[in-house]
Amino acid sequence: MNNFEFKNPTKILFGEGQIENLSKEIPKNSKILMLYGGGSIKKNGIYDQVKEALSNYEVVEFGGIPANPEYSVLMKALKLIKNENIDCLLAVGGGSVIDGTKFLSAAALYKGDSPWNLLTDNKPITEGMPFATVLTLPATGSEMNSGAVITREETKEKLAMGGPGLFPVFSILDPQVIRSIPQRQLANGITDAFTHVLEQYMTYPTGALLQDRFAESILQTLVEVAPAILKDPADYNAASNFMWSCTMALNGLIQQGVPGDWAVHAMGHELTALYGIDHARTLAIVGPNHYRYNFESKKVKLAQYAERIWNIVEGTVEEKANIGIEKTEEFFHSLGINTKLSEYTDEYSETGSIVSKRFTDRGWTGLGEHKTLTPSDAEKIIEMSY
């Protein structure tokens, strides 16, 4: 096991009826900017619950944060923060709204020329305006981590940021919100969380037995509850386990002491930036072929994964590893997720070379757990995914 330091300061309020406890967690006299997305919270009752809980606070609202939080939209919210002297942010939404709020948390205190530099400078964010979240769509784990990804349509870019200053102060997770989530978004959430775990697990053995079992337990839980969630999102037990699995998949715990491989995310972000494909679906497009391309360096963990998640106990290491990849694709297909780029766009023929050039221009010359995956390798993986 590798050395590590681990701290996660986010408080979690989990369960039915927790939204009403907002007023117990936010300091009195706070002036709150409440941020949300396309307005679904006004249809499913969450908006009314939040407003009722905040009835004794001064609350300014900003809606319309899109599925991939757009820089130009967030800049309008930043202007509102400064004009209204906001001192507390509340994200009511899924990963996109929460990621956008994290950007605003950092941008509100930023002293530089352009807040976009927060994403291009590749420096950890050490301070931000206090913010909290009410999670409405389990998927990204953003409610309990310090990372965010922001899109800039003008330049077709999608870049990440993060640091110790971007943890939510607290997050409210009420599994009842899941009953109103459309099937497509539920499938995306399962796929997103599943891939998050794989990226922290599917590398090479380091003797981190507990971390492996943590990761495998999340994967097994997602496989187990996926059919129940898609059949009946109002199944509270299934919803609870789904929601908590998504949070645990990316709150920092399972990545401690082990190598990580975030190349799938890096490539997936480019597919979203170029074609607007749902984030989770880009991971399903790239992930299996990433494992095929890097088979030799990952086959031991792939075989372990096949044994422990899919009960593949017969065959050589190579045979089990290959079946593990096939089972992963089958799982995505069972959720209604297509795994070929050509199933999402007809304009895919130059995608590999475009992504390779972007990685080269950014200096991303060594991705993956060994820091050896080159832009040329990324090009080949994406071409395998056509």
Outline where the language-model segments fall.
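Glycine/serine-rich anion-binding loops at beta->alpha junctions
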Residues: I86-K102, T136-S142, L274
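Short alpha-helical scaffolding segments that buttress acidic/His motifs in well-ordered protein cores
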Residues: F194-L198, A239-L250, G287, T328, ...
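C-terminal charged capping/lid subdomain of soluble metabolic enzymes
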Residues: L302, I309-Y386
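A glycine/threonine-rich phosphate-anchoring loop and its flanking beta-alpha core
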Residues: T10, E20, Y110-L210, Q304
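Active-site segments that bind and position negatively charged phosphate/pyrophosphate groups
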Residues: Q200, Y204-K327
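Short Gly/Thr/Asp-enriched flexible loops that form oxyanion-binding sites at enzyme active sites
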Residues: L78, V97-K111, M144-N145
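ATP/NTP phosphate-donor binding region
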Residues: M1-C88, L341-S342
